[in-house]
Amino acid sequence: MAPKDIMTNSHAKSILNTMNSLRKSQTLCDVTLRVNLKDFPAHRIVLAACSDYFCAMFTNELSEKGKPYVDIQGLTSSTMEILLDFVYTETVHVTVENVQELLPAACLLQLKGVKQACCDFLESQLDPSNCLGIRDFAETHNCLELMQAAEVYSQKHFPEVVQHEEFMLLHQEEVEKLIHCDEIQINSEEPVFEAVINWVKHNRHEREKSLPQLLQYVRMPLLTPRYITDVIDAEPLIRCSLQCRDLVDEAKKFHLRPELRSQMQGPRTRVRLGANEVLLVIGGFGSQQSPIDIVEKYDPKTQEWSVLPSITRKRRYVATVSLGDRVYVIGGYDGRSRLSSVECLDYTSEEDGVWYSVAPMNVRRGLAGATTLGDMIYVSGGFDGSRRHTSMERYDPNIDQWSMLGDMQTAREGAGLVVANGVIYCLGGYDGLNILSSVERYDPHTGHWSHVTPMATKRSGAGVSLLNDHIYVVGGFDGTAHLSSVEAYNIRTDSWTTMTSMTTPRCYVGATVLRGRLYAIAGYDGNSLLNSVECYDPLIDSWAVVTSMATQRCDAGVCVLREK
């Protein structure tokens, strides 16, 4: 029989338990640690094995090498007791009350396990009120992973972080570093501007002189014209500073002179990277001339596509929205009939998740429009296989229930649905006889639909999305041609403007906004299905082709989802 090495899991634990018992009974102890006049008998070999600090003390030619007593400075006796317990038991009790003493002591005595336990504990305690302080604490003690975690947390929760006292007590240089960061996750620059103003007002006498310097890091050209005129222009701190007014004038010029935007590119016109948002493309009509169930994800940071779990049912003419961490795939056509069924995916970046069914709509709908308002999903129009619908219904995910709302004035399939300023807009489509240019808006407070200025071009199967207070409509079909043209609706003036056309005609195209840019995804160009994607940058009024999907398709659902 061949010899075999056998390892027992209990051996090391048994030795530690015995050594700890010997320590407590002061048996075979050969050194006493003295902390604030309190003595802690211990074993040199155990201390040296666990701590580089003690190993160097007892093996090098230091004065403490042969002494029976060693004075330890810089920590309390209660902290020393916790650390010795860890040395002999591998267990450390970390609390909110002791962590600020324990971590520096662990660093001093080079107890890596305690240091890591303290860092893990502090990371678990991060919240908007303490993340800035924890970051500074971590930096002081060279805890790089904790420092990075706290920094990322402050970026991810920026609007909440700046409401707390820790932010108000930052030095100017620390405020600059935070607001200069590309990675802070915000939906607009408004929280950044307001954070700067509030920080200055917290100690106006000392800080007012810092305002022009801080405002250089606020990307005011990316704010809406209304916010600039209604809020920034009215701020007394801005009005009494010539340097601040110059920065505001720059932002106004950016909006008033779009032809000059390409010359104004710089740090203040660069959209922040913000949240790790990804783009999902779901289902559609594929190259096999049938509905598909394929789901692809685009990450703008890597500019790469990947495949996610397929939906449970093949669908074209599908509507898709995201709400929180969930993606909803609504209605569509499976090749045999129009659908009322709805699928949902709970998604995080760490786990792809699985699709499951939620309550079906009251009406079967293909080519319906869908959008979200508050924490509700709204779906309107569509074709059920025999007629086009004027109806709209609303889904409440909290109770998993659909309810019918007021009808549109015109039946539509292939229309776009989008929310702007708390109002729902339905644009274009096909009524069974004509391609439409008309636009209706729904006021959720009154429950009524009304017409607004129609589009310049009639369109069905166009992509629709909201970008910088304008509703963009891209591509579609006008009854004769597949369109590459783009127009934008100004909500304030109730008027349309023709924008730069896409590089490719696209009907049944998906459209969505990601990181301040408008994406037009796939579609049909009149000859073939597309897998190409192009991206519109409003700052330079230009389209650029980005990485193509793996799958050629039209009629797909498109949405943007924020990864955790």
Curated annotation (Swiss-Prot):
Residues 29-96 form the BTB domain. It is found in: Cytoplasmic vesicle, COPII-coated vesicle. GO terms for biological process: COPII vesicle coating; endoplasmic reticulum to Golgi vesicle-mediated transport; neural crest cell development; neural crest formation; proteasome-mediated ubiquitin-dependent protein catabolic process; protein monoubiquitination; Wnt signaling pathway. Keywords: Cytoplasmic vesicle, Developmental protein, ER-Golgi transport, Kelch repeat, Repeat, Transport, Ubl conjugation pathway, Wnt signaling pathway. GO terms for cellular component: COPII vesicle coat; COPII-coated ER to Golgi transport vesicle; Cul3-RING ubiquitin ligase complex; cytoplasm. Kelch repeats lie at residues 278-325, 327-375, 376-422, 423-469, 471-516, 518-563. Gene3D superfamilies: 1.25.40.420, Kelch-type beta propeller, Potassium Channel Kv1.1, Chain A. GO terms for molecular function: ubiquitin-like ligase-substrate adaptor activity. CDD domains: BACK_KLHL12 (cd18452), BTB_POZ_KLHL12_C3IP1_DKIR (cd18242). Residues 131-232 form the BACK domain. PANTHER family: KELCH-LIKE PROTEIN 32, LD33804P. Substrate-specific adapter of a BCR (BTB-CUL3-RBX1) E3 ubiquitin ligase complex that acts as a negative regulator of Wnt signaling pathway and ER-Golgi transport. The BCR(KLHL12) complex is involved in ER-Golgi transport by regulating the size of COPII coats, thereby playing a key role in collagen export, which is required for embryonic stem (ES) cells division. This is Kelch-like protein 12. It comes from Xenopus laevis.
